[in-house]
């Protein structure tokens, strides 16, 4: 059998509602890897919020973070690493417009740090940023923003986060890629224009000298649309956002709570 590239989203897909990997999922992924298939974590999360899962799964493959802005080989210097950023002016402007977009918080995300407007645990969950507690150096201050971020993350009180994403795309004249993220959380993520999970996977396939027909992808949310459409075979979770279904080749019969990805991989490869 041709060895496959298996792109897996984390939240709402590989992880359960407690943001954990089940033992069955871990065992299945390890068996798949041992057979020579390449499991690629492909997530909106920054690296610091995905690295523990990478270690738990004992992966040695590249990882895609920030919805495609960062493609890298964790823990190693890799000649094919690609790190893309967006102009910091967008971060500064969104902070000024914080009330217009009803944002609980706005954060500039970098590979190894972040700045958040409300480092307050009653407003933002520190675990969302891969830390136990917020520190003074996490406080957003305009003068601290000297470099362009990989992405901007914001949590909004607006009832329809999809409508807000559309509205912000129009406001910024489609110069950013603005996606919903985080399953049930009202979170928007802004990445560089044209950047998405498929964009990063296409780059990775070129690096690996592989064809997209050998790419399988699993996702559940709006930010997985391009990835599922691009893959040779795209699977939407049973719990997927209905808007994702037209882009998938198949919907799984099980949710992320029911180890949907692991059972699908078992049926395909074990």
Regions found by a protein language model. Name each.
Residues 57-59, 67, 171-174, 230-231, ...:
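Short, structured coil segments at secondary-structure junctions
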Residues 1-5, 22, 188-270:
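Mg2+-dependent phosphoryl-transfer enzymes with acidic/Ser/Thr/Gly-rich catalytic loops
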Residues 21-124:
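Active-site phosphate-binding/coordination module
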Residues 103-105, 109-218, 222:
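Conserved acidic, metal-coordinating active-site core of Asp-based
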Residues 36-40, 59-61, 150-151, 213-214, ...:
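Short active-site oxyanion
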Residues 19-35, 83-90, 130-134, 192-206, ...:
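Short, acidic loop-to-helix structural element flanking the phosphoryl-transfer center
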Residues 32, 43, 67, 152, ...:
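Residue-level signal for inorganic ion chemistry
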């Amino acid at each position: 059998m041709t060895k496959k590239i298996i792109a897996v989203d984390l939240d709402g897909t590989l992880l359960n509602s407690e943001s954990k990997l089940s033992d069955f999922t871990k065992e299945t992924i390890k068996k798949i890897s041992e057979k020579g298939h390449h499991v690629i974590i492909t997530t909106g999360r920054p690296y610091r919020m995905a690295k523990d899962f990478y270690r738990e799964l004992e992966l040695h493959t590249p990882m895609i973070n920030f919805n495609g802005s960062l493609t890298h080989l964790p823990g190693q210097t890799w000649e094919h690493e690609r790190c893309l950023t967006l102009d910091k002016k967008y971060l500064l402007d969104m902070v000024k417009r914080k009330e217009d977009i009803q944002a609980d918080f706005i954060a500039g995300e970098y590979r190894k740090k972040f700045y958040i407007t409300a480092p307050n645990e009653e407003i933002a969950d520190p675990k969302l940023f891969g830390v136990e507690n917020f520190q003074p150096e996490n406080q957003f201050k305009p003068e601290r923003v000297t470099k362009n971020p990989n992405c901007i993350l914001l949590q909004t009180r607006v009832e329809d986060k999809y409508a807000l994403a559309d509205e912000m795309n129009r406001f910024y004249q489609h110069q950013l890629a603005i996606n919903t993220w985080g399953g049930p959380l009202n979170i928007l993520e802004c990445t560089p224009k044209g950047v998405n999970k498929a964009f990063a996977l296409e780059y990775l396939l070129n690096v690996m000298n592989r064809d997209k027909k050998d790419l399988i992808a699993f996702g559940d949310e709006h930010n997985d649309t391009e990835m599922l459409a691009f893959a040779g075979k795209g699977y939407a979770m049973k719990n997927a956002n209905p808007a994702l279904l037209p882009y998938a080749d198949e919907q799984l019969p099980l949710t992320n709570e029911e180890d949907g990805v692991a059972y699908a991989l078992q049926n395909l490869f074990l």
